[in-house]
C-alpha cells in the first residue's frame, strides 16, 4: 500500500508540479473553491486552515521562547508515534496533520541560552525528525538512504533506530545543558512521553545525555494553555454562535411543551452543529427541574412541561478550539409572561459566584487559592453552591490549574496547585442552590458555565457575556 501511494504520489507530482506538499501550508491557487453555503459560520475549511497556520507560527514565535527561558530549558524533545500522539501535538502541528508520521520527533533548541542574550523567536530552532515542516514552521531532517528511482518517491523518511541516531546527532551538535521531556505524575498534558519512546531514546543517547533530562511540567502545560489575541477574536464569534443556538433551542421554535423530550433537544443540538460544519467534544445534555418533583421521579428523558426549569451543557469545536457553556431557561405557564421571582433570585446567586470567580482569577494565583477565595466570599453572602471551573482552548478540559471539582471543594491536590498564566481561557463552571418560595422553598440548582478570557495584561473578561436572565420558552418573539 505504501509503495502504491508513492507511485501515485509521483504521478500526481508529474501532473501538477506546483502542488503543495501534504500537511504543509495550503496553496490558495489550487483546487476549485468550495461549494457556496449560506450556513457556514466560520468559512471554508481552506480558509480556516490558512488562519490556523498563521496562529501556529505566531504562537510558537510568541510563547515558546520566553517559556523555555523561564523554565531554564535550552532543549525540549517531544517524540511520539502514529496514533499515540503527545497531548502537546495539536499545539505544535498544522491543521492538516491529524497524527504523527510513523515516529515523529520534534526538537526545540534555544541557541541564545548559552550566551544568556535576550530571548526572541529567532533564538529557537525548531527541528522535525520525521513528518513534515508543518508549513515551514519546522526544519525537516530527512534520511540519507537512497531510494530506487523507479518509485518516483522523494527522499526517504527517517525510520527506526536511524531516528534516534539523528536525534543524538542534533543533540551533540548543540550540546544542551538541560533537556526537557514530557513526563509527569500530576498533569496528563505533560505526560505524553511513552515508556517505549523513553527507552528508545535512552538506549541510543546514553547516560551522557539522559542525565540532562528534566521533567519540565509547566513548559508544555503553559504552551498548550496560551492563546493569541487573534484566537480570542475568533473565540468570541464561536461563543456568539453558541448563544444563538441555545436561545433557539430554548424557545418555542424548538420546544412544544407536553410533547418535546430532553433527548429531542440533545439531538437537535448534535444535528445543528453537524449541519453547520461544526464539531463537539462531548455529548450535550439537557435536564429538567420541576416543582414538587425530585430528579429520580422525572426519569432520564422527561417530557418538558410548563413551569419547568431547563438546563443545558453544550459545546462546539472549530479550528481545534472548544467552547463549554451551560444555560438555563423557564417554560412559561399559561398566562405567565416572566419567571417567578424566586427563580430569578436563584440565577442572581449564581451570577454573584461568577463575579467572585472573575474577580479572584488572576495570573500568579493557584487554582486552589482562587477556589478558597471564592468559597469565602460565597459564605459572606450566604450563598450555597459549588465551584468547579477548568481551563479551555485546544482541549475542552484544558491545560492549566483546576479551580475545584464538584466533589473536591477543599482544593484539588496537584492539579489545583498550578498557577494561572496570562493569555489563557477558562470555563467558569459552578452552581448555586437556592430555596424558591414559589416552589414551597424547594431547592433549585442554577448551574452555569461561561467561557472567560484572561488577556495578555492579566485582566479577565467574558468571551462574549454571561447569562443574567433566564431564557423564556413560550414568550412572544
Question: Which residues are covered by each model-predicted region?
Answer:
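Bacterial N-terminal signal peptides
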Residues: 6-16
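Positively charged n-region of N-terminal signal peptides that target proteins for export
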Residues: 1-4
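Sec/Tat signal peptide C-region and signal peptidase I cleavage site
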Residues: 18-22
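Active-site neighborhoods and metal-handling regions in enzymes and metal-associated proteins
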Residues: 23-477
